[in-house]
Amino acid sequence: MTKLLLGFMGVGKTTVAAQLDEHFLDMDRLIEAKIGMSISAFFSYRGEAAFRKLESDTLQEVLALDNETIVSTGGGVVLSKANRELIRKNHKHNILLTASFEVLYDRLKKDRLCQRPLFLNHSKAEFYAIFQQRMALYEGLADKVINVEHRTPKEVAAIIANMS
């Protein structure tokens, strides 16, 4: 069964997935490979609706895999009702990684290599509203929740590896 790592941007989904399995699937990288450009460039060129369609198609593909796979999802994967229904069908294997808004905001502010449009184009208050909206959706889908704030990615991966 596919284990989906859910959570807000900056929480460490990709880093933890890499600790769990060197052959993990990162939905954002899969999408970028399909479109031949960065997601931020695609957003600018084609818009969010086109991106969300690609994201839904990619989610369907990774959930259809027969083998046990670790998947790092994009932070906005839960915005689509169709995606939420697909994720619900992956019952017992949806793992939410959490941290406080302030911790995530600070991480994103310090990350000079990966500047994300959603972060750059909103005030802190607007970004907090996005965080709250998405957290409610993540929590409604999560079978297991792990707070990552005082844990290393390796410790979080060990917790996930020991889950039944």
Swiss-Prot record:
Pathway(s): Metabolic intermediate biosynthesis; chorismate biosynthesis; chorismate from D-erythrose 4-phosphate and phosphoenolpyruvate: step 5/7
Cofactor(s) the record lists: Mg(2+)
GO MF annotation: an example: magnesium ion binding
InterPro entries: P-loop_NTPase (IPR027417), Shikimate/glucono_kinase (IPR031322), Shikimate_kinase/TSH1 (IPR000623), Shikimate_kinase_CS (IPR023000)
Binding, substrate: D28, R52, G75, R134
Binding site for Mg(2+): T14
Keyword Amino-acid biosynthesis: yes
PROSITE patterns (UniProt xref): SHIKIMATE_KINASE
The protein's Enzyme Commission number: 2.7.1.71
Purpose of the protein: Catalyzes the specific phosphorylation of the 3-hydroxyl group of shikimic acid using ATP as a cosubstrate.
Protein name per the record: Shikimate kinase
Gene: aroK
